[in-house]
Amino acid sequence: MHANKEFKDFVLARDDLDCIVLPLLETMYAAPSVAPSHLYVILILLLMLSEDVAFNEGAHRRMHVPSVPWFAERAVSDISLGSLMLVMMLRTLQYNSTRAMDAFVHENCFAIISNMAPHVRGIENYCAQRVMSVVDVIGRRRKKREARAEVTEDETRLIVLLLELVATSLRPSMLPFNLELMYALVQRREVVDTLSVDMDTDIASLAAPLVSMVDFFENVVETERAAECHEAASGAPPPPPPRG
């Protein structure tokens, strides 16, 4: 695919790209027992696919995986190919950062997530929860290392990358399609609360607007609940929700 543009175009034009990508992801799942050279080839192939806008859009909107029997950590079903790819990139990054610490793996996972971020749509609950969980885990680890002046650039870059993904996925035009990510953000608001006052200005500047978004969302929910209680008790029409 790298040296033959015609072949790459042929592959990207296929309607069944999931048949190509799923075996690659399954092999990645067995990363501890996979030769590094094989993992490198898989990441390069996924990176080339993620550079195509049409692939990214199709992976999130049209290509759905009914079940993932090889994913042993929990039952995963009816997940978009895009969400599954994001889950696998995050899983690989976490494994790599705690054990192998292979710079090539890190860089390619970063690049794949970055390529897919602008096209995230219909993100599944498990993927949304995984994004926030990784931000939380890496943020806590970074905080401990910060106290010992041992913060690594990769930890900061990963937090920035994932906060950018969240912010992009929750922009006004995409929010209605990524409500699971909004719910995950609300449930884990303490994560962005902490990051909004981080000493790193890039992290703080990305987390602060997300805190404001959560505040507004919670205010709307509370207002609607109060209105429903008022209407049920008195039969009076509810007050209008606050405007953003």
What do the PLM-derived regions correspond to, one by one?
Residues 1-37:
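Alpha-solenoid helical-repeat scaffolds
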Residues 36-244:
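Eukaryotic scaffolding regions of large macromolecular assemblies
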